[in-house]
Structure formats: structure tokens, C-alpha cells
């Protein structure tokens, strides 16, 4: 009886330590790829809706103590100036859910020396993005500024089939397009609907960065 209780207590301690380890990793997480999109293609409810999505799924993963922002750019509209993705994500450094640093600063993030790739750009749950869903919405150029050619899918508020476009990056740094190894500006999407994004290797995912 005593031996059984000792064994059970030991197992409980191991589980508790493991749980604390996972919790600590989630608390230090400051970067992730969304494990789910809006389900409405590139219509994310604008940048505000995308930020809310980041915050909600981060909170569900135990990292809601941080302020999260979507890595998205938007064109000037309704009296508001254009927004560059690089200007809205804080200063860094940024770590994934496992504590691996993907970039130290904004400059490092947008350089060839960053550590963002298919093995490190994990979801908030710690999973890797499937290769056939590697297109990540950004609406940005490689330097983190707004894409050329107009508002990205109505500033991420439209999901019209076959109309409009938003730049996407390849999270695994491979594939086709004009710049297949770019994590944030590989090519433009072929429309803004969910079907359009899926057809070219995406699923409406985007990057989330903690600003603090």
C-alpha cells in the first residue's frame, strides 16, 4: 500500500513538473503562427479583428498576459494612414512556444539572418504548419512595409472569390512564386476567398507577435 502511494505520488510530481514546464514555455512565447484562420479567407475583420484573433488564441494557449499584434500591413483608408506590419509588432526579441528565438530585433527579423523557418515558426500549440498550407497572410513586402498594388484584400476585410490579392509568405521558406524562400513576401494570393487561399497553398493563417 505504501509502495503504491509512493509510486502514485512520484507520478503526480512528474506530471506537475511537466505541466509547469509547458506553462513556463507558453508564458515566454512571444511569436506564433495562428493554428486556425478566420474561416473567411482573407477577411480577418481588418487589423483590429486580426489582433483580437491573436489575443484570443494566445490566451487559450496560456499566453494571454502579453499584448499581441498580427503581422499585417494595410493601405491608407477612411482618413487613416497606411500601416506597415514591421511597425506594429514591438521591438523583439521574439521566441516561439518552445523558447527558440526566431528574431532578436525588427531589423534582424527582416534580414537573411533571422531564424524563422518551418521548424521554428510554430503555432501557439507548438505544431508545425503543414507544407500544403504554408502561405501565410502578410500584405507586406520583404522589408515589412505595405505591399504594392493596392490594399491587401480590402485591408483584410474582404473575401471576394477571385478578386483582390494579399501578399503571402512561405513559413517553410520553400515552394514556388516570385520569392519562394521569403517568409513574408513570396507571392500574391489569387483572390481573397477561403477557396482562393486554399487553392494556392494557404488556409488563412497569419503571424502573431507580442509587443511586450
Task: Identify what each model region corresponds to.
Residues 22-212:
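Secreted/extracellular ectodomain signature
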Residues 14-22:
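C-terminal segment of classical bacterial N-terminal signal peptides
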Residues 12-13, 32:
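Charged/polar interaction segments and conserved charged motifs
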Residues 1-10:
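Bacterial N-terminal signal peptides that target proteins for export
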Amino acid at each position: 500500500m505504501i509502495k503504491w502511494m509512493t509510486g502514485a505520488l512520484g507520478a503526480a510530481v512528474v506530471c506537475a513538473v511537466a505541466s509547469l514546464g509547458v506553462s513556463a514555455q507558453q508564458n515566454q512565447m512571444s511569436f506564433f503562427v495562428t493554428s486556425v484562420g478566420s474561416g473567411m479567407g482573407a477577411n480577418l475583420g481588418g487589423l483590429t479583428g486580426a489582433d483580437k484573433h491573436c489575443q484570443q488564441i494566445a490566451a487559450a494557449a496560456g499566453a494571454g498576459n502579453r499584448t499581441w499584434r498580427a503581422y499585417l500591413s494595410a493601405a491608407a483608408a477612411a482618413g487613416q494612414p497606411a500601416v506597415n506590419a514591421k511597425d506594429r509588432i514591438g521591438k523583439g526579441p521574439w521566441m516561439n512556444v518552445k523558447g527558440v528565438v526566431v528574431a532578436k530585433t525588427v531589423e534582424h527579423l527582416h534580414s537573411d539572418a533571422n531564424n524563422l523557418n518551418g521548424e521554428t515558426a510554430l503555432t501557439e500549440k507548438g505544431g508545425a504548419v503543414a507544407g500544403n498550407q504554408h502561405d501565410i497572410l502578410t500584405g507586406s513586402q520583404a522589408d515589412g512595409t505595405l505591399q504594392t498594388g493596392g490594399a491587401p484584400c480590402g485591408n483584410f476585410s474582404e473575401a471576394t472569390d477571385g478578386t483582390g490579392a494579399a501578399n503571402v509568405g512561405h513559413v517553410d521558406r520553400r515552394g514556388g512564386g516570385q520569392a519562394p524562400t521569403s517568409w513574408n513576401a513570396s507571392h500574391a494570393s489569387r483572390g481573397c476567398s477561403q477557396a482562393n487561399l486554399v487553392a494556392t497553398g494557404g488556409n488563412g493563417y497569419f503571424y502573431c507577435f507580442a509587443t511586450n
